[in-house]
Amino acid sequence: MAELDFNIQATVRTDKGKGASRRLRHEDKVPAILYGGQGEPIALALDHNKVNNMADYEAFYSHIVTLEFDGKKHQAILKDMQRHPYKPKLTHLDFQRVEKGHKLHTNLPLHFLNETTAKGVKEEGGVVVHHVNDVEITVLPKDLPEYLEVDIAELSVGDTIHLTDLKLPKGVELVELTKGEDHDQAVVSITAPRVEKEETEEDTVAPGDVPAENSKDADEE
């Protein structure tokens, strides 16, 4: 897995409200908040362009981020990101503190391997169906992976991979499976391709049409 460094310089903001947030955006800053753990929530201002560039990386949404302000470094994970409805702009970010020795509760993306070469696709003409694209996990910060890999190379048409089939890295626990066996949901499957019914000659006969042989029999009667 690639090692990416998400280090963000921040400043503590004291002005709050819509007006203050609007002024920040005019200065190419984006408002954010850091909360959770043993500390109080802290309102922050971040460099918009830098954060926007980081948002292009999938790992930004599941990786530990370092926020630097007031001469200290604070580790956190991104919990929410709000975007402008039609402009390529971020409008707000929520970060949750990461504390050493305390488990994180976050979502992890799934990477599906061998989708085009899977047995059920290449040999049987099946179609891959993704039932989920990420999973909810708990994990210690030191064991947090960037994503989970799901290899479907051996799947045939009709086969399904469930949560219990996933190969989990050390220390990773799936939240859904802690709720009971009935939460072992499907992750990915291969289904048979949809076959459209071919139109037959009988299907094309209009309701009022009568085959010639039947018409002749009727005349003889």
Curated annotation (Swiss-Prot):
GO terms for cellular component: cytosolic large ribosomal subunit. Keywords: Ribonucleoprotein, Ribosomal protein, RNA-binding, rRNA-binding. One of its GO terms (biological process) is translation. Residues 192-221 are annotated as: Disordered. GO terms for molecular function: 5S rRNA binding; structural constituent of ribosome. The keyword Ribonucleoprotein applies. It holds the Pfam family Ribosomal_TL5_C. Part of the 50S ribosomal subunit; part of the 5S rRNA/L5/L18/L25 subcomplex. Contacts the 5S rRNA. Binds to the 5S rRNA independently of L5 and L18. NCBIfam families: bL25_bact_ctc, PRK05618.1-2, PRK05618.1-5, PRK05943.1. HAMAP family: Ribosomal_bL25, Ribosomal_bL25_CTC. Belongs to the bacterial ribosomal protein bL25 family. CTC subfamily. This is one of the proteins that binds to the 5S RNA in the ribosome where it forms part of the central protuberance. This is Large ribosomal subunit protein bL25. The lineage of its organism: Bacteria, Pseudomonadati, Pseudomonadota, Gammaproteobacteria, Alteromonadales. The gene is rplY.
